[in-house]
Amino acid sequence: PKSKGFNIFNRWQYTNTDKGVVGFLGFRFMKDEKDSGEDVDNMKVKRLPWLSEINTNRFDSNFKLGYVNPKIPYQSVGFQMAYSNHKQESFFGLRNYNIKQNSFYSNFIYNSIIGNTMNKFKAGLNYSYDDFEEFIDADKTIYNRVDKSIGSFFEYSYDSLEKLSLVAGLRYDFHNNLGSFFTPRFHIRYQPL
């Protein structure tokens, strides 16, 4: 196999501890070309060689912003977003496979306590979007699909710092293709001394 690629990544960070703010912004671009197959020069029997090629271009970006209350350090808010664009053109022998995908994700989360730091909770919202366009040579079909999902969650955690810890939560999601659904969560851990 032979390959050549190019990657560039850049990330910036902002921190202000007096105000409790931290932020990140990042970008990445990748170009990758791969060739593989049989070496026709060393073949004893002349025939069509099996070859493959994968050419990929990808762009990613992300953003994160967080705030921790300087006067109440157990209380925080966070927000993040991510976007990616992926394009791939390829063939494997006589079969072609091409895909384009655009993805977006965002998340908002709030953390705090109930009474004391042994009783913590987090609540939040998230949204995701995926747009796929696939071409599969086997049946000469283009498959297009869009997935969109929005969700919310609440999670409570208790930690006695000695023997017992537990996490209980509930999540609600609505998906454009799968409908709406609830997902409960419960974990308990007991550690005798």
Predicted regions, residues:
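Gram-negative and organellar
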Residues: M43, N57, N85-Q88, K100-F104, ...
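Exposed loop/turn and edge beta-strand positions of beta-sandwich/beta-sheet ligand-binding modules
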Residues: F6, F59, F104, I150, ...
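Outer-membrane beta-barrel channels and translocator barrels
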Residues: T15-K19, P70-I72, I113-T117, L161-K163, ...
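Structural signature of Gram-negative outer-membrane beta-barrels, strongest in the C-terminal barrel
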Residues: M118, N126, F135-I136, K140-L193
